[in-house]
UniProtKB/Swiss-Prot annotation:
It comes from the Eukaryota. Residues 514-540 are annotated as: Disordered. It is found in: Mitochondrion. InterPro entries: Pentatricopeptide_rpt, PPR-containing_protein, PROP1-like_PPR_dom, TPR-like_helical_dom_sf. PROSITE patterns: PPR (PS51375). Belongs to the PPR family. P subfamily. Residues 1-87 form a transit peptide. This is Pentatricopeptide repeat-containing protein At1g80880, mitochondrial. PANTHER family: MEMBRANE-ASSOCIATED SALT-INDUCIBLE PROTEIN-LIKE, PENTACOTRIPEPTIDE-REPEAT REGION OF PRORP DOMAIN-CONTAINING PROTEIN. Keywords: Mitochondrion, Repeat, Transit peptide. PPR repeats lie at residues 154-184, 188-222, 223-253, 257-292, 293-327, 328-362, 363-397, 402-428, 429-463, 464-498. One of its GO terms (cellular component) is mitochondrion.
Amino acid sequence: MAAIVAIGRKLARTPQWRIVQHQSLLRRAVSTSFSSSVSQNHSFSSAFHRAGHVHSQVLSYLPHFASSNRFSTKTISETFDINLTALAPLEKGLIDLIRQVSELESEADAMASLEDSSFDLNHDSFYSLIWELRDEWRLAFLAFKWGEKRGCDDQKSCDLMIWVLGNHQKFNIAWCLIRDMFNVSKDTRKAMFLMMDRYAAANDTSQAIRTFDIMDKFKHTPYDEAFQGLLCALCRHGHIEKAEEFMLASKKLFPVDVEGFNVILNGWCNIWTDVTEAKRIWREMGNYCITPNKDSYSHMISCFSKVGNLFDSLRLYDEMKKRGLAPGIEVYNSLVYVLTREDCFDEAMKLMKKLNEEGLKPDSVTYNSMIRPLCEAGKLDVARNVLATMISENLSPTVDTFHAFLEAVNFEKTLEVLGQMKISDLGPTEETFLLILGKLFKGKQPENALKIWAEMDRFEIVANPALYLATIQGLLSCGWLEKAREIYSEMKSKGFVGNPMLQKLLEEQKVKGVRKSKRMNLQKVGSQEGYKGQRSVDRK
């Protein structure tokens, strides 16, 4: 505990990812609506209106076709997740107080001020406080020290603090906290998984592997679930080759099996979507006499569908059924997507009927698998009809539903969709605005991008480093140097760390602008002198 207290003192001196019932398949009346004329189509507001009255059971944005990894033990991905299902509301002014006391000379002064305040702190509000300060790790850690003093530092709050520290690559402090947790007999298992994941996110694969290797020091014997957890952490952050290398190098201790190969296969299919590598892993499984299972087929079909390979998607689906493997909802979602994408909408509708015959029920992801490719193809009228059908089946739109429309609509409709997201209690989120800003800057619409930037306050979105950097880079790409410099200065004034490469680029653009201005002035002067000389010749 002494180590973490010492670090806390030093910091105090520093002023900074369903269950819904489905009554029946698409009714005949609904099927008719799909073929109705444009004049019968639902508008965005009418289609989304009922969404606000349907409780959404999907509160976080998941990448399209992101498949869960099923292991013989419980799902590994749960160990990397932070529980945000019930964040307690915070008292007004609490975060401002944390900011103010962080400016005091010592941790003792900061703690005294917090203790003297009228704010109450319990386990739930403490967890919410750390979450709200997640982008400013120093403030989050100061708040953690206060909660620790109040006895609010339960298991989940400690795990959250480790996640925050890992996000900011403050691994030494995180390890001090883990040691303190261990010394007071708190479970450090999830903390170790979080450290593996955060190291992988920071591209430090060697330290992720080392974390797995030292689990025994915290009385966690490296076991199959932890091994597969490491592979999952490496793959989910793009280090798929490293994960495969480690899996094969460890085969004496952890014999290769279908579950381990499925983690690697999922990486190539759903993280990178590399068909060539996915096919190689499929062949490699055969070389090790490992028979692909239901999940293996699901990953491959997902991969083929995302690149528009309808033939191989259907081929593997048929092969899967011949082997007696019942396709899950993920497989049908992939097939619905590729059929819709490849302009086989009627066949996709027939497949929806097939779902009922298989004892499965279409969910929000199934409908999103239609909506997204329709939006990508500019078929917004049909997409709106699918949305209306989805809502009529008591299925709630998800963040992915709204994002699909946001990528396809014009600027005026963008604001309307954002409003519907808020009504449906699905955001918008920081990721939503990153998507919109990226689209607008790509379309060379800096004026509209800045209008969206101004709209963030209305939706209670506080600009974070990712939003600042995306906006600054977008403005630079559109030649808006002065506005880019203005927003960069604003970012730094709020205590966010500057980006050296971006700073250099801003300075280079400034120098280029000065040089261009000087050249234009010289050219102007030269032309004026030439004009004067010509007049003097004419007079002679």
